[in-house]
């Protein structure tokens, strides 16, 4: 989505069931810069605002926004901001964060609409991936249960055969 709206940086924050950021995937930032920044964001400031209010925010300059929490050392400068929640059937899965609109002072309402549509599709894809993962786990459990029953039945048959042999 970063090139679609002309953002210098983008991130996908995936949250755990409690709403905290558990994965933070960045785009537009090289690995060395990402490493120097340090640990994942914890969801304070603007990132936390989107988590708490679960709605989109378009901000012209995050450096003067009252919700700003600040940047860690070695973080690249950022100004314009667009944050959009990702949800499916009312369940929050994560957020898209975009910063530094290229060629304009801030993100437009059209940019926001595009990212919200993208977030809808991303939410469906993320939900499908989670469902697929759950199905794989269930398949493994089913297979283990089948093997367990086969072993159990085989052992019972062997014990019965041994019992018959002993009676003989």
Give, region by region, the residue ranges found by the protein language model.
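Coiled-coil dimerization/phosphotransfer module
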Residues: 3-25, 30-41, 49-52, 59, ...
